[in-house]
């Protein structure tokens, strides 16, 4: 009997957390009371065991000015679903279909709060993350903190009537190691506020000794220990950036050193009439796979200072690339994979490469060739 009793506790903190985010929706005001719908979306590994699926959790509420604990609210699980990619990408090698995440939502239909000047923090903490995350040290021992701030009247009179930005839940983009990729991390705002995006730190929360704290602590929170070469601002290294206006992450994906999982946290700031109203954050493990996309990739510029002849090749070769078409920008062309071309005169030429020309998996790119012998 005692062994059966202990099993759920031991499995409850097994590695499974893969990110998540809070959102809230303003419902109205009655007297001095503000009402909100608050929802937490949690990403976890597929096929979680029963100890990892908590039927109820606690949202902890704090005064944002004093950090005083206001109350804990028990919230029921409202939805569970798998985020599945049903088919492989036609123009990428390898298998990409299958389950990427199990999504669990906790929806608090109505939270009533006293109007105040500083606003409120709402937090939840849970341990632990999956093992062997490439950009974290000892990831399986690290928990997670999810938090969002509801603004108070000290931001503006209208700020407490704000509804947060909300992120899309469509995170099955295929990212291939050492290849260029884009990943849409954009959000939408029901109030029409202007949104800006930046990478930010992932937070620690919970522990192996206390995997499910009954009360989340108040901020500030400890930052996770990133592996060498990575940080909250550079979660996938120096070659990956986020567009501050669109929220699209792009760049050349790093190598796979362990599982290929990289923790990414994006903070979104809402501005109204030029003034910051609120912010929210989403954390997610992006999976980097050992696949090869069909891409035409060249260096931005090819300088030649020792003659008129240059050899070219695609920077992202693949067995799935069947044909090459080169336009050297001077009226000459080639269909070789690695052509050598001699220019007749000095100048700057626009070279174009098309791979699998006329095929469903065609791609093209351009670069400048500067001939100054």
Regions found by a protein language model. Give the residues of each.
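Bacterial N-terminal signal peptides
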Residues: 1-8
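Extracellular/lumenal mature domains of secreted and surface-exposed proteins
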Residues: 15-373
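Sec/Tat signal peptide C-region and signal peptidase I cleavage site
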Residues: 10-14
């Amino acid at each position: 009997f005692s062994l059966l009793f202990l099993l759920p506790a031991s499995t409850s903190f097994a590695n499974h957390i893969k990110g998540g985010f809070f959102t809230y929706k303003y419902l109205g005001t009655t007297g001095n009371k503000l009402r909100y719908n608050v929802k937490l979306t949690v990403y976890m590994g597929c096929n979680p065991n029963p100890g990892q699926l908590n039927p109820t959790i606690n949202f902890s509420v704090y005064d944002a000015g004093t950090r005083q604990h206001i109350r804990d609210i028990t919230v029921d699980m409202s939805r569970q679903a798998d985020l599945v990619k049903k088919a492989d990408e036609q123009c990428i090698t390898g298998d990409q279909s299958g389950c990427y995440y199990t999504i669990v939502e906790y929806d608090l239909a109505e939270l009533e709060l006293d109007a105040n000047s500083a606003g409120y923090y709402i937090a939840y903490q849970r341990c632990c993350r999956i093992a062997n995350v490439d950009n974290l040290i000892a990831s399986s021992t690290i928990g997670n903190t999810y938090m969002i701030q509801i603004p108070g009247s000290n931001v503006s009179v209208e700020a407490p009537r704000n509804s947060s930005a909300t992120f899309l839940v469509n995170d099955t983009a295929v990212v291939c190691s050492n290849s260029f990729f884009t990943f849409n991390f954009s959000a939408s705002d029901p109030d029409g506020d202007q949104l800006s995006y930046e990478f930010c730190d992932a937070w620690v929360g919970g522990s192996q000794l206390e995997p499910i704290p009954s009360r989340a602590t108040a901020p500030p929170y400890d930052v996770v220990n990133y592996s060498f070469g990575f940080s909250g601002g550079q979660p996938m290294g120096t070659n990956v950036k986020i567009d501050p206006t669109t929220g699209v992450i792009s760049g050349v994906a790093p190598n796979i050193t362990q599982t290929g999982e990289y923790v990414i946290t994006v903070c979104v700031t809402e501005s109204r009439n030029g003034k910051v109203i609120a912010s929210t954050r989403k954390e997610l493990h992006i999976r980097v796979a050992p696949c090869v996309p069909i891409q035409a990739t060249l260096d931005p510029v090819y300088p030649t200072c020792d003659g008129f002849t240059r050899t070219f090749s695609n920077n992202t070769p693949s067995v799935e690339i069947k044909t090459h078409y080169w336009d050297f920008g001077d009226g000459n062309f080639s269909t070789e994979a690695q052509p050598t071309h001699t220019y007749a005169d000095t100048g700057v030429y626009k070279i174009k490469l098309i791979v699998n020309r006329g095929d469903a998996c065609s791609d093209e790119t351009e670069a400048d060739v500067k001939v100054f012998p």
